[in-house]
Structures are given as C-alpha cells and as structure tokens.
Amino acid sequence: MDVSEGGVTVSVPTASGGGEGAADDVFFNATQELNRDLTVATLAAFREREPRAASYLDAMTASGIRGVRAANAGWDVTMADVDADAVELATSNLARNGLDGEVVARDANSLLHDHDRVLDVVDIDPFGSPMPFADAAFANARNLVCVTATDTAPLCGAHFESGVRKYSATPRNTNYHAEMGLRILLGALARTAARYDVGVTPILSHVSDHYVRTYLELDHRATDANAAVEQVGHVYHCQQCLSRDHEYGLVAAPRAECPRCGGHQVLTAGPLWLGPAHEEAFAASVREQLTREMGEASQAFHLLQTIEGELHEPTHYDQHRLYSQWGEPAVGMAEFLDQLRDAGLRASRTHFGGTTFKTDGGLAEVEAAVL
C-alpha cells in the first residue's frame, strides 16, 4: 500500500490484517510519524547550526521512509538494512520520488566502521535498545547522532534486570519513569561516546508514546568527553515521601535514610544524565522548521513549545501524585505554578505529562508554597 507523508509517497508493507505494519520482515510504523516529522525539522535546524553537515545515514531503514524524507530535504542519504526485501523496497521508494541516494544491504555496525565513508549525521532507530550500535555510531559519526530507544520498560526500571544489563546502570521505577528512562539512556550514551574521546551535548530530547528520542551533537576532544561524563551522576529517591536529590559523579553514595522524612526506603538510580536534555534555542529553531505538509506538525509544535520552557532540573514531579500524598484536593496547574513562583521558586510544565512540573525548589519548599 502507498503512504504519503511529509511531501513524499512511499510503498509500505501491508500487515496480514490489512493495516500498516510488518509483512515479509519489512517493518513500517505509522505511529512514528511524529518522530519522523521532528527528525526532518531537526535536520533542517541543525544544518543552519552546522552548514557543513551534508551526509545522513538511516542505519535501519526498513521501508526507507525516514531516509526518503531526509533525501527530499536535500541530504546526501545512505540507507542501510540487513534484510534484502527492505533494501529492495527502500530503493524503489527513493526512485519513485525521483530522489538520489544509496541503499545498501549491510549491518549498521559494519557500515559505520567502513572508514571510506564520512557520515555527518547518523540515525539509530532500532527495534528495542540502541546500545548495540552506539559504539560504532560515536566512533565514526562527525556531527550528530540521533537515537531512538523503544525498550522503555528496561529504561525506566519496570524490567529492572534488563535495564541493568543493557544500560550498565540501575534504573528505578518511579512516578517520573519517563524522565528516568530518558536520563538512563543519555547517561549510557554519554559514557559510551567518552570511550572514543567524544563529548555529547543533547540539543533536543523527548519521550513520546512508547519511545525515547534524543539528538546528540558531537565534539571530538577528550576534554569535551570529560565534560560530558561530569554531567552524569545519581538520583536518590524516597519511596515514602517522594522527595529526591541528586549528585554528580560515577560513584554512588546511597542514602541510609531520607533527610526529609527519616524513612529508610531511599532508592539509588544511576549512573544517569543530570545535565540539560535540550537547548531552548535549538528547540525553538526546530519548531520554526515545521511545515504544513507534516502530518503531526500541530502536535510537534506544542511538544517543542513545552520543551522550550521546561526547566533543566533533573526529575519532575506529578502534581496529582503529590496532592494524593498530602491528602488534599489538587488545584489547577496554572494556579499551582503561580503559587510556586509567588514563593520565589522557578517552575515550569514538562512534556512528560499534563500534570507534571519541574522546580528548583525541594519538596519541602513546594509543600510550604502550596498548602
């Protein structure tokens, strides 16, 4: 069947039930249109930031729709897949749109280690964890690595042992599980890049539906790698009163008791990324690159607008969860945030949920401001 998206039309597999999906081992995910719209807009914004960036690798291309859209936006595209049917389909989709590009039947790691190729932007969008491809990406990409992770249960700690194995970290299943997953992923990626003397800067990150997506700008100096590793640390979360604090460093110092309530159910999470997960100005520039032909432009616009205003403090709170903990009825979010600001705290909404917020104050300060 044919799908039109972002100014291109491609053939995609038809699942056995007649819908869009997987057939003959070639996968197409219609629900990832937001992800692809944001990818194209991010590539456009990044090219303004780094005009020399020209080449783009869609490392797990499947139907090729992401790579075709990148080629349509003017990128020198290479599309790769280990499946011969996917390579044939992606090649056909490039041709039917009158676009140039190369489609190769190669494993992503093998292709990335081919030093005859210069790849400015590498896009890793596997099914599951991206970590098996992270070393090759950071060792060989020049400017930008784009990463999707769909294994959100291991990342957020719901599948604890799997998260420990895949990300060499301790993820904890908290009421801010989406941000936990994002920061566990960023921490693992930063540590991987540092092995190759590459420093990463997250210029845009988001958690949408059941995936985590981040765009990491690269700097190829050991000092930059050191600086990125310095943004990694641990979060200490009290299961009883929901307070938490954090500290930088790869060595954890577990808390015997909560400094706020004196409870002894304090979880240690990490190593994870404690630094900013986005740059406000870059998020704004991505928003400016959204076009009417993008099917999820409206959702992308509002997502980016929220991210622009989101504070960088690690870990958000859920307002409804706090009021439930306090045994009080929740007020409206706008009123709630105004109360925090009136008390001298910085506060913002977050893109992690409609009742989530960030603040530079501790939980005791939040409680004093609103109760």
Swiss-Prot record:
Keywords annotated in UniProt: Metal-binding, Methyltransferase, RNA-binding, S-adenosyl-L-methionine, Transferase, tRNA processing, tRNA-binding, Zinc
SUPFAM superfamilies xref list: S-adenosyl-L-methionine-dependent methyltransferases
GO biological process: tRNA N2-guanine methylation
Domain Trm1 methyltransferase: 1-370
GO molecular function: tRNA (guanine(26)-N2)-dimethyltransferase activity; tRNA binding
InterPro entries: SAM-dependent_MTases_sf, Trm1, TRM1_arc_bac, tRNA_met_Trm1_C
EC code(s) of this entry: 2.1.1.216
Superkingdom of the source species: Archaea
Residues that hold S-adenosyl-L-methionine according to the record: 36, 66, 81, 107-108
Catalytic activity: guanosine(26) in tRNA + 2 S-adenosyl-L-methionine = N(2)-dimethylguanosine(26) in tRNA + 2 S-adenosyl-L-homocysteine + 2 H(+)
Main EC class the enzyme belongs to: transferase
Binding positions for Zn(2+) per the UniProt entry: 238, 241, 258, 261
Pfam families: TRM (PF02005)
Family note: Belongs to the class I-like SAM-binding methyltransferase superfamily. Trm1 family.
HAMAP family tied to this protein: tRNA_dimethyltr_TRM1
Role noted for this protein: Dimethylates a single guanine residue at position 26 of a number of tRNAs using S-adenosyl-L-methionine as donor of the methyl groups.
Descriptive protein name: tRNA (guanine(26)-N(2))-dimethyltransferase
Naturally occurring in which organism (per UniProt): Halobacterium salinarum (strain ATCC 700922 / JCM 11081 / NRC-1) (Halobacterium halobium)
